Amino acid sequence: MQSLRAAFRRRTPIFLKPYEFSTNVFGLRCRYYSQVRHNGALTDLEYHRVADDTLDVLNDTFEDLLEEVGKKDYDIQYANGVITLMLGEKGTYVINKQPPAHQIWLSSPVSGPKHYEYSLKSKTWCSTRDEGTLLGILSSEFSKWFSRPIEFKKSEDF
C-alpha cells in the first residue's frame, strides 16, 4: 500500500506496471503481479493470462458439449478461476487455478486429483507426476464417456 500512496503523491501513472483492480465488500483492491521470471517459469502476470485463457476455452468446450448432450442433471459453473462440471451419475469434475504454485489442479472422478504446470517449451499444461497433459487427460476421459472423439483445443493466445 505504501508504494501505491507514493505513486499518487508523485503523480506517477501506476498503470505502467501490471496491476489488477477488483472490488469486494471492503472496497477497491489493487494487486500487483510480478514480472520477474524465476528459473524460466511464468511470471505472475503470464500465469494468470494463460490460466484464464485455458479455463475460458475449457468452459466454452464443456458448455457446447453439455448443450449437445442435453441431460438435465448435467451442469457447469465457472467463477473465480474454478470450473465445476457436474455430470450426474458419472461424478463431478473440478478444475481450478492455484496461483501460489502457478498450477492448474484437476479433480476427476475417473483419474483422481492431478496438478499441472505450464510448459513454455511445449505450450501446454503438463502433469507434475507423469507425462500427461491437462487437455490430453480430459480428451481421453470425455471421449470414453461420450463414445466419440472429444477434442479440447488450445487458445490462440497461449
Curated annotation (Swiss-Prot):
GO terms for cellular component: mitochondrial [2Fe-2S] assembly complex; mitochondrial matrix; mitochondrion. GO terms for biological process: [2Fe-2S] cluster assembly; heme biosynthetic process; intracellular iron ion homeostasis; iron ion transport; iron-sulfur cluster assembly. It is found in: Mitochondrion. This is Frataxin homolog, mitochondrial. It catalyses: 4 Fe(2+) + O2 + 4 H(+) = 4 Fe(3+) + 2 H2O. Its EC number is 1.16.3.1. Belongs to the frataxin family. The keyword Transcription does not apply. Monomer. Oligomer. InterPro entries: Frataxin, Frataxin/CyaY, Frataxin/CyaY_sf, Frataxin_CS. Keywords: Heme biosynthesis, Ion transport, Iron, Iron storage, Iron transport, Mitochondrion, Oxidoreductase, Transit peptide, Transport. Promotes the biosynthesis of heme as well as the assembly and repair of iron-sulfur clusters by delivering Fe(2+) to proteins involved in these pathways. May play a role in the protection against iron-catalyzed oxidative stress through its ability to catalyze the oxidation of Fe(2+) to Fe(3+). May be able to store large amounts of the metal in the form of a ferrihydrite mineral by oligomerization. One of its GO terms (molecular function) is ferroxidase activity.
